């Protein structure tokens, strides 16, 4: 696949900033573009097999995701497969921390191409998300548990759905899940619970 990068800037020791990123899918269609991707990494946890990102930003995201039908893979599947371990005989445990993930000015399109879209009707087979803005803290993600705080997610969908703010905290393991401080705000309604 083709990947192009406009500019790479290495900050103090552990920060990387990449401007004007574009990746095509295997058919040559635009798959992922971003005006800026930035991350600040913590190297000390790597010695213990942990991945720690103190902050990450994704600005001007434009993602075009599709699949031909319900049974075919998404056009991004080859990227996910390339990230998977080639050694299937042993398992490397996942241990990930992201102190702060900020997404601004994002757009995500998802389409299942064998189903015709209905204008003005929300459909999980045809998402047209714009004005995506998010602030997420991934306290801890392992094979066994997750500790996640969604400070804010806001977006608009082409169907007319407008999510002004979604926030919650999630703590889950293999036995139970606890959802706290949940709040969702739409243009004319709001729901929240502790």
What are these regions (language model features)?
Residues 73-79, 124:
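Membrane-proximal, glycine/serine-rich, low-complexity loop/turn segments characteristic
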Residues 1-4:
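Extracellular/lumenal and peripheral-membrane lipid-interaction modules
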Residues 101, 169-171:
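Well-ordered beta-strand segments characteristic of repetitive beta-sheet solenoids
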């Amino acid at each position: 696949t083709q990947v192009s990068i406009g500019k790479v800037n290495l900050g103090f020791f552990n920060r990387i900033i990449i401007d004007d990123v574009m990746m095509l899918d295997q058919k040559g269609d635009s798959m992922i573009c971003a005006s800026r991707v930035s991350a600040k990494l913590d190297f000390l946890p790597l010695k213990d097999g942990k991945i720690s990102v103190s902050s990450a930003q994704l600005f001007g995201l434009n993602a075009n995701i599709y699949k031909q039908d319900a049974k075919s893979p998404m056009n991004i599947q080859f990227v996910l497969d390339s990230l998977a371990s080639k050694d299937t005989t042993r398992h490397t445990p996942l241990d990930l921390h992201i102190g702060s993930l900020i997404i601004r000015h994002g757009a995500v399109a998802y389409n299942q191409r064998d189903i015709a879209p209905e204008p003005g009707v929300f459909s999980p087979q045809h998402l047209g998300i714009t004005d995506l803005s998010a602030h997420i803290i991934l306290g801890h993600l392992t094979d066994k548990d997750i500790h996640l705080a969604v400070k804010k997610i806001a977006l608009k969908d082409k169907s007319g759905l407008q999510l002004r703010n979604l926030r919650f905290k999630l703590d889950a393991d293999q036995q139970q899940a606890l959802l706290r401080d949940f709040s969702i705000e739409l243009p004319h309604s709001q729901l929240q619970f502790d």
